[in-house]
Amino acid sequence: MSLLDFFLKSRKENTAKLAKERLQIIVAHERTSRSGPDYLPQLKQDILDVIRKYVQIDPEQVTVQLDKKGEQLSVLELNIMLSDDKPQNADDNTEETKS
């Protein structure tokens, strides 16, 4: 009977070990596939709202990227293609100063 217990016990340990390894792989994959923190889309929207107060921008011309530099440093990179057009409020301000 002890011989049978030996084979069953080692099989259970191998199954548990295999399940643990698979779970670790899944968790590691999920961590790397996440594009960034949960607050990143709202942060992007807030930054764009502030910029829109001063300059007209096309949402298609905006890229936001979060890069990790080491374990403790993250870099948020925001690229915006600005048009050569004058802001809408620029004409209003010049007319008021002329009056």
Swiss-Prot record:
Domain of life per record: Bacteria
SUPFAM superfamilies, alphabetized: Cell division protein MinE topological specificity domain
GO biological process: cell division; regulation of division septum assembly
Gene3D superfamilies according to UniProt: Cell division topological specificity factor MinE
Pfam families: MinE
Family membership: Belongs to the MinE family.
Protein name as annotated: Cell division topological specificity factor
Gene name, Swiss-Prot/TrEMBL: minE
